[in-house]
Amino acid sequence: MIKLDKHTYKNGVVKTQIRIVDGYRNENDEPRQRTIESFGYLEDKENPDEFLAALREYDKKRIKEKRVNITKASTLPFYEDDGSTVYHFGYKYLEAIYNELKLDEMFNKIDSKCKYNIAEIFKFLVIQRILSPDSKRATYQRIENLYGKKYDLSLHQLYRSLAIFGDASNDIQRILNDEIKSLVGRDTSNVFFDSTNYYFQKDLESEDQYEEVCPLVTGKTNIKNQKIIEVTDEEGNYKQFKAIPGLMKRGVSKEHVVDPIIQMGLLMDKNGIPICMQVFPGNTSDSLTLLPILNEAKGSFGLGRTVVVADKGMNTTKNIDTAVNNGDGFMFSQILKGKKGKRYQDRIFDESLYTVVDEDYRYQEFIEDYDATDLDGNRVVRQRKVLIYYNGATARREKNKRDEKVAKAKKSLTNNAYMVSHGYDKYLIEESYVENTGEIADKKSYKINKEKIKEEEKYDGMFAIITSELDYDQAKIRETYHGLWRIEESFRVTKSELELRPIYVTNEKHIKGHFIICFVALCVLRILQKKMNYSISIERIVRALNMCKCTEIVNGVIHVLKDDTTKQFVKKISQEKKIEYTSEELDKILSETVEDYKLIIKEFNSKLCTSLITKSDFESFLKSIKLKK
């Protein structure tokens, strides 16, 4: 059945949560409801009435297909039960990987202080974050959907656990690092770093906290980028405090939202598996997120000599000097335009310096001196290699994007829309003089900035990378830098498949708990991908595991079924994501999902089970699911 629950937020906004629920009775014969599927909020849908109509049809179809007919050939009597519950058993494959990470041992030490099993809660939240990401409240409502799992906890206990997870974040990451090394190995000859931000479902920023400085410091105005506040109390005592900024701050959002955001930096190994992460206030500059995480990896994770690979946002003098002073290397992209690229202007357009491979690729590489600061603060001269190259495919892509914006800019001139800020307004320039007469214009007008377009065209397809590794040739530099795509994809996964944002919790320990849950979920998925040689995407892995459902029928028999009931519903509401699926495409997706499942189970010590199986045999099958070594 469909259930609509209204929720009133602190700002007075009322939203209607949409769920499909099934009724059941607990051990005390008390009526209860369990959430089968959650569909977000009604107010967020483009057409709420059409959405509800489609959902009602979907629910009728779901109930009809839950009814199980057992033929005479099965030797079991015919059975039909409208109220039978469909359970999820695909989680067992994720649990098999999770168990190899040995996090339960750490949680059990903490668990002695708690009245509830936080090890099981953490595992439950990680698995649900992969299979069915949602708010903690909605996740709790699905607590009985996993076959064979019984959780004795309240929603309040689940929220309290988040604070414990937040406090244990660093310990969890250290244990993960050790176990991943032994499970699939780590290659840290190169490590990849990037940062992104995530927005909150809240309008207000979090307040800063202040911590007293003991002993007092002199000659400093900041401690590790934290401003020192000097105070004299009523009794004349002089005190110092350092400001600890809250995490929820407005900053430069990568998704262009105005809500408070939080920064996350992520360090990843050469295999594409995360090493560690850290969160920062939302107004933290990207370039300031690298060193705290790199220092943590070097100090607590035993990270040896490595080459740090990052984009131009991390290309600062301090980051470069610190990496080299620590005995590490660096590889950053380099800006070619403007003041930051001034030193390369003469070389960029000197065709005689390039080695031409074909019409789409030419390059030049050279070693240059640069000014640096050593560990003792002395100015020194060091060397680095610079690769400048032209890529024809990139040039054509950049030209096409610019042509689209210029076309929109021209159109805006005809309908007077140029006063509104758009992505294309940078190609417009204000006219101060009448073009034909040279007289001062009596009213503001705009024209296409042809000079800017011409200047941009010069750099189409041009790219530069600087590195400390003087022995790397141009091919190895490009190949190494290309590895950054995996960390960019990881951010996409956290925002789509894992739905890390919007963030609903606001307590800072809860926020850190939320992030470590998502981090572990990402690690679990990456481990499985690594075992499968990255043959299928995370999206397809999740879809295949969500296909694995079962329901208990008469005489201790389990019906193991392929869950494809959402196919019809996806077809009806595909406009939500502006994707039009045909019946043939949906059938193809389902067929692909079955084949993906067959690929996944090859990495486990288990076999396919039949659609009708005794309960004891089914549970033996589930126990046999272990990750292959």
Where does each model-flagged region fall?
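Conserved glycine(s) in the ABC-transporter nucleotide-binding domain "signature"
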Residues: 1-119
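Anion-binding and metal-coordination hotspots
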Residues: 2-3, 17, 28-31, 101-629
